[in-house]
Amino acid sequence: MGLYDRDYTQDSRLPGTFSSRVYGWMTAGLAVTALTSLGLYATGAYRTLFSLWWVWCFATLGVSFYIQAQIQKLSVPAVMGLFLAYSVLEGMFFGTMVPVYAAQFGGGIVWAAFGSAAVIFGLSAAYGAFTKSDLTQIHRILMLALIGLMVISLGFLVVSLFTPMPLMYLLICYLGLIIFVGLTVVDAQSIRRVARSVGDHGDLSYKLSLIMALQMYCNVIMIFWYLLQIFASSDKRR
């Protein structure tokens, strides 16, 4: 039986505490990512580290998969440390990539993507938290779509080595944006549901809140990333 499949209905205490912890850790992770990115920019280290962007990508995937696979065995401090390590690695990636976009398209495009991502994420999370509809089936569809997106993206990466396909890339970005907006909605509903049922069961509750914080963190980060790609593509076509 998985960590999410257990029966939490015996205790409905402190739902606000659980939700606050999820969004608190998500915010902390975003702050760590932002500070790491700013540090790379301020020191100029992003120029040296730019060629290693793929290392940060694979490292974040590795940390994420490890947390998911070992969550029941890891201690709470270990999960906290891995969450913060993940945030730093994302900061390394964005700290090397965002300055390139700012230099090519202007800093305004970065702020536009950031502001739009914040608004879209906030509205999506609010809808998910307050809607009465059961989004369980939609979550399954979105996860299948996410797998499809990963396969398509890898295929595009290979093909683009031989021929540029800007329109295809733009379509992939829009698809990714839609998927992660949808995941934000369903994950927000999951947070509300678990918050109402899990109560405060010590380590289990804290681990669940950290996992959900990581999910929401990834959602907002990917919304920002796809918006940045879309805005950059639009700027190129002018």
From Swiss-Prot:
InterPro entries: Bax_inhibitor_1-related. Belongs to the BI1 family. It holds the Pfam family Bax1-I. It comes from the Bacteria. Keywords: Cell membrane, Membrane, Transmembrane, Transmembrane helix. The keyword Metal-binding does not apply. The chain crosses the membrane at residues 22-42, 49-69, 78-98, 105-125, 141-161, 166-186, 208-228. The keyword Hydrolase does not apply. It is a multi-pass membrane protein. It is found in: Cell membrane. Its main location: membrane. This is Uncharacterized protein TC_0206.
